Amino acid sequence: MNKQKLLIVGGGGMVGATAAYACALRSVIEEIVLIDRNEDLAWGQAADINDAMGIDRNVVVHTGNYSDINDDDIVVITAGAPQLPGQTRLELIDVNAKIMRDIVKNIMANGAKPY
C-alpha cells in the first residue's frame, strides 16, 4: 500500500500553509508536499510546520513540484492572485481562472486522475 500523500498547490501562501499545518497536527496524512511558484516561501512554510510539530510526529512536510503527484494522491489548490486595493473579487476572476487552468494542466500532465 502506498503512503498517503497530500499535495497543496499554493502551499507557500497563508491558506495553503494553514491547511498543511492543520493536517499535520491531526496526523491525517503521512506526507504533505507544498508546491508554490515561490519555492523559498514554500520551503520556509514547510520548515516552520516541521519545527512546530516537534520530535514526536508521524507526518513529513516538505516542498516539491508537480512531478511529485501520483494517481492516488490528494491535491488541494489554494493558489490565487492577491486582491489589490480597490479591486473587487469579480475583477479577479479572469486572473484566477488563468492560474487555475495552468495548475490543472500541470496536475493532469503529471499523472493525476480525477475522480
Predicted regions: what they are:
Residues 2-6:
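Extreme N-terminal starter segment of soluble prokaryotic enzymes
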Residues 8-9, 34:
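Hydrophobic Val/Ile/Leu positions in short beta-strands of Rossmann-like dinucleotide-binding domains
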Residues 12:
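Conserved glycine-rich cofactor-binding loop
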Residues 15-17:
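N-terminal Rossmann-fold NAD(P) dinucleotide-binding loop
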Residues 23:
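Aromatic pocket-lining residues of Rossmann-like dinucleotide-binding sites
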Residues 31, 35-72:
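Conserved N-terminal Rossmann-fold NAD(P) cofactor-binding segment
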Residues 79-81:
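Conserved NAD(P)H cofactor-binding loop of Rossmann-fold oxidoreductase domains
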Residues 89-115:
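Rossmann-like NAD(P)(H) cofactor-binding subdomain of soluble oxidoreductases
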